Amino acid sequence: MPYAIDLFCGAGGMSEGITQAGFHILFSSDINADVEKTYVNRHEQLGLIQNVNTYFHRGDIREIDGKFILEKIKNLKMFISGERKVPDDIDAIFGGPPCQGFSRAGKRDPNDPRNLLFKEYLRVINQIRPKYVIMENVEGFNDTKFYGYIGVTGKEYDDESLAPVILRNEFSLIGYNTLEPKVLLASDYGVPQNRKRAIFIAYREGEKVPRYPEPMFNEDNKITVLEAIGDLIKDENIRNKVNPQLTQYQKDSINGRTPTINGGVVRNDNQLLQNIETSNHLPIIKERFSLYRDGEDSAALRKRIEKEGIDISLKPHLIKECCEKLNMEKDEVLNILKNGNINKEIIDVLLTKKNIRTRLSKDKCSLTVVTLPDDYISPFEDRTFSVREMARLQSFDDNFVFLGKRTTGGPRRKLEVPQYSQVGNAVPPLLARAVAKEIYLVIEETE
């Protein structure tokens, strides 16, 4: 079984895929205490026990080096006892330096310290010198420019040098060849989500050339939201109607895809599905959600109401809100909304100015799963999604339990990583598996 290191591991999406592909993770690291609880708990489920056959380090990558990592690996009980031989080489290092600094959404700051964490990743790689390196990031990483960047060997780069150009050059300077960076679409690999990730693969000089995975699904057979989470609908009548029997994806999620260290399945002794709590929305919020059609976002809803009008006669809480804020009688409000040609003031009261949401389409792949629960409405019920539903859309097994606070807000968001963020920040396990499997195969061919 090839050995891997998982850096910037988060709650463990990449780790799931690495393990499913056949690797044994010897060392993993992340800076956050919330994700540590989730990650270590999951590894214990899989039979990966701290200091015995794996080691998780919570800390800043800027404060550790290759010597520290290799020492922790060498001192694992399975190596000290002689049960297994300490490897001469680490087969692969996987990692995704935090992506906020590379995001296309919002203003980019060239001085954002998160943009330089991939330099620390390179430093550790140069010190450990694994056979293969896999780095993942947001799609925007490929057109990120750096200013005043100095590489791990001291080379200075011109301002506005592109990140992939720097990476390829840096790897070359430390004795690694690279594949052309590639953006992969998660739904091509069995994830019910149109999430794009930039993947960068490097291999040590002299090692067999790896390749990117070929798409496994096409537009005709990609997993839809209904096929992924239809069995998690809370209303039994709706569930029985739209999801009368389990789909293969649902069965795989329930039974689990990630094997234990011995090749077995994770036992779920209490049989209770975790992370299924949903928000207790106020009646007026539910009525507002009910205005959205399948696959419709706030902008499209506004345009539809402006053009066609809308009937809210069966929505008493919205009627009351409009009457009070617009200082109108009920019949006047209903008539104005029904007839179309409605002004912005009325729509702002009906929907609220900050209402930016989308009701996912049940018959399509999900949009990119995000870290906030409020952005998406269920296609089946007038509510937002549970952590478990979001995890399903990311391709996590149902027996993968997310620990810590369910959600958080305000200044705490800078320090805490609640369950929704753990899910939204993760690499989809099935995408990670597809990439890791290609690395596994070239290692097996060599050996």
Residue ranges of each PLM-predicted region?
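C-terminal target-recognition/interaction regions appended to catalytic cores
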Residues: 257-447
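Class I SAM-dependent methyltransferase "Motif I" SAM/SAH-binding loop
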Residues: 8-9
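Short beta->alpha hinge that forms the Motif I/post-I loop of the SAM-binding pocket
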Residues: 30-34
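Glycine-rich SAM-binding Motif I of class I
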Residues: 12, 16
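Extreme N-terminal starter segment of soluble prokaryotic enzymes
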Residues: 1-5
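Class I S-adenosyl-L-methionine
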Residues: 72-75, 79-89, 97-341
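A short, Lys/Arg-enriched amphipathic alpha-helix followed by its capping loop at the start of a domain
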Residues: 17-23, 42
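S-adenosyl-L-methionine
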Residues: 38-81
